[in-house]
Amino acid sequence: MNQTILKTMIAEWLEEFALPALIPRDAAPVPADLRNLSEILAIVGPRRAGKTFVMYQMIAGLIEQGFAGRDDILFLDFEDYRLRDFAPEDMETLFSAFRQLTGKDPAWLFFDEIHQIPAWSRVIRSLHNRGRYRIVISGSNARLLLPDIATELRGRYRDHLILPFSFKETLRWHDISWTERTFYTAAKGDLLRIFDTFLKTGGFPEVLKKDSPGERRQLLQNYYQTIFYRDIVERYNIRAKSLMEGMMTCCLHQFSSLFSLSAFEKGLKSQRQPGSKRTLANYLAYLQEAFFILCADKFSYSPRQRVMNPKKIFLIDPGFIALTEDFSENKGRILENVVAIELYRRRQTFNYYKNRRECDFIVRDAESVNLQAIQVCWTLTTGNRERELRGLLAAMEELSLPQGLILTYDEEESLPAAPSRQIAVMPVWKWLLG
C-alpha cells in the first residue's frame, strides 16, 4: 500500500484531529485498567453505537492521566475509504510510516473496525506476540464476542460490549441527574418524559441529536440499509438478496415475538419461493452477527429442545421499531424489547418460558446457577392481571423460584402470590436505573 497515504492519515491523527466532547459511557474501560493492559481488548457492538467514541474516551483518559502522549498512540479507522486496499502485509509499512513521523514505535494501537482487514485475527495475534504494544480493537460483528475468536487469539483476548445508549446514559445525554429521592418528587416527570422519548427513539447517539421525528426516522432507515447491504449482503456474499431482505423485514415486524424457521420456510414454499431451512438458519445467524437482532431460545434443560423450538426475536435498539407500526399498538412489546436489550447489556443469559402458560424471561447469571423469572407488560389491568400472574407463577413453581418480577411502565407494588412465593411489580424505567 502507498506509504504516503498512511503517513497522511497518521499525521492527521497526530496534528489535526481534536478529540470530540464526550458523553462518558458506563461500559468504557477506565485508564487505570488500561495502563497495564496485557490482553487484546476488543470493543464490540452495533454499527453507530458509539464504539469509536469509547475509544476516544479511553485515549483521552490515558493522555489526561499522563499514561501516554498523543505520539505514543496509533489510531486508525479501517472503514476509511483510503484503507480499502489495506492488506495484512501492509502493517509493517504502517509502522514504518509512524516511526518516520515520530521517531519511535507506538506503544498503543487503537484499530477501529479491524474486521475489515482480511485475516485480521492472525495479524493482531502476531502483533500481540511481539510484546511491544497494548492493543485495543473494535468491530461491528457479534462473532468477536464468540469463544472461537478468543481461541484464535490464543486466549489473550477479552471483549467489551458497547450498545446504543442505555436509559441511564440517555439521561446523562440530556443532562438530567437523579437520585433515588427523585423517584418520589415532581422531578420524576422529567425522567418519564425522557423515558417516553427513549422508547420511541432508542439510544443511537446520532439519532438523539436529531430534532424532528422525520429526521430520526430517516437516519434509522439509513442504519437499517447499511446493516443490510454492508454488514450482511457484502460481508457474507449473499446472492438471494430478496430472501435475506424478507427475513430481515419479518424480524423487524416480529420484535418481541416468536419466530419459527419452519413456518417461514412453509410460507416460502406456499409462494413457490426458494429457501432451505439451513439457508434460513444461516441468514438468521447473520442478522445476529450484524447486531440487528437478539434471539432467545425456549427455556429447557435439553439442548435439543432449545434448538428445535421457535426463537423469540428482539431488535438491538428500540429506535428501529419506529420503522414499523404505530407506537400505541406495540407498547407492551416495546417494553419487553427494552428489557431484553438491558439483559444483554448486562451480559445475562435469558430465555423465554412457554408451557401451558408463558413467562417472558427466565434469566440466568454467569454461572447459570441463579435463575430469575420476569414478566413484562405495559400495565396490569383486570383484563390481563390473571394471565400475567399465572404465567409468572407457572415458571416460578416449575423452577422452584421464591420470587418473581413484573415490570410495567409505571406501577409498583408487592403481591403475595402463594405460600413461600412473592411477586414484586416495578416500573421498567426504575429497573433500568438499578
Language-model segment annotations:
Residues 1-30:
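N-terminal pre-Walker A segment at the start of P-loop NTPase domains
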Residues 2-7, 147-257:
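Interdomain motor-coupling "hinge/lid" segment immediately C-terminal to the ATP-binding subdomain
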Residues 3, 72, 212-370:
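Accessory nucleic acid-recognition modules appended to NTPase machines
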Residues 43:
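Hydrophobic anchor at the beta1->P-loop junction of P-loop NTPases
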Residues 51:
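Conserved lysine of the Walker
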Residues 54:
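Hydrophobic positions on the alpha1 helix immediately C-terminal to the Walker A/P-loop
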Residues 75-104:
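Short glycine-rich substrate-engagement loop in P-loop NTPases that contacts/grips substrate
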Residues 134-140, 161:
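Structural recognition of the conserved hydrophobic beta-strand(s) that form the central parallel beta-sheet
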